[in-house]
Amino acid sequence: MIRTKNIFLIGPVGAGKSTIGKQLAKQLKLEFIDSDDVIEKKCGVDINWIFDLEGEEGFRKREREVIAEILAEKQNIVLATGGGAILDPETRSLLSSRGKVVYLEATIEQQLERTSKDTKRPLLRVDDKRPVLEQLMAEREPLYRSIADVVVETNGATVKNIVNKISTFLVEETIL
């Protein structure tokens, strides 16, 4: 039986899923995919536009479909998911059954710092992001933990350090 080396990065906005995912994929010589990028490319519009037109529910439906398509078509990938991808039970099930799930944990302070000038996050198009981030964390944290094979704290760590922690875990789990 051929083992697939699928690695799925989950976590809140600003945790570094895309940045870390690109470097992890490079180090492991795997393909990197960002589900948000795939959604935008497939729809021909940005995520903010989808949220404005279809709401979060419409976006989550598209996200679930895109992640299912990616997992049906690709193997040996590093997939960075959107921060809310885990809200959908079907997506959680897909991720946990098709590879190793890495939860990149980030503090509210980190998220604020990393998203302060970001306009591509529809749920953060508000003046005071802190209450929104706190609410999202309260809602999503248990879901992240419920499917995570490993939790990696990103606070104060370099991208290289985080990638090395994930690689070490994957070696220990004999996925590499």
Curated annotation (Swiss-Prot):
Recorded metabolic or biological pathway in which this protein acts: Metabolic intermediate biosynthesis; chorismate biosynthesis; chorismate from D-erythrose 4-phosphate and phosphoenolpyruvate: step 5/7
Residues that hold substrate according to the record: 36, 60, 83, 140
Family matches, as Gene3D superfamilies: P-loop containing nucleotide triphosphate hydrolases (3.40.50.300)
Residues at which Mg(2+) binds: 18
Any Gene Ontology CC annotation: cytosol
Name of a matching Pfam family: SKI
Swiss-Prot/TrEMBL cofactor(s): Mg(2+)
Localization (cell): Cytoplasm
Residues noted as binding ATP in the record, renumbered to the chain: 14-19, 121
Enzymatic class: transferase
Gene Ontology terms: biological process: amino acid biosynthetic process; aromatic amino acid family biosynthetic process; chorismate biosynthetic process
Record keyword Oxidoreductase present: no
Cofactor note: Binds 1 Mg(2+) ion per subunit.
Signal peptide: none
Catalysed conversion reaction: shikimate + ATP = 3-phosphoshikimate + ADP + H(+)
EC number(s) recorded for this UniProt protein: 2.7.1.71
Top-rank taxon: Bacteria
Keyword Cytoplasm: yes
GO terms, molecular function: ATP binding; ATP hydrolysis activity; magnesium ion binding; shikimate kinase activity
InterPro entries, alphabetized: AAA+_ATPase (IPR003593), P-loop_NTPase (IPR027417), Shikimate/glucono_kinase (IPR031322), Shikimate_kinase/TSH1 (IPR000623), Shikimate_kinase_CS (IPR023000)
Family membership: Belongs to the shikimate kinase family.
Functional description taken from the UniProt entry: Catalyzes the specific phosphorylation of the 3-hydroxyl group of shikimic acid using ATP as a cosubstrate.
Subunit field text: Monomer.
Name the record gives this protein: Shikimate kinase
Organism, scientific name: Francisella tularensis subsp. tularensis (strain SCHU S4 / Schu 4)
Lineage: Bacteria, Pseudomonadati, Pseudomonadota, Gammaproteobacteria, Thiotrichales
Gene name, Swiss-Prot/TrEMBL: aroK
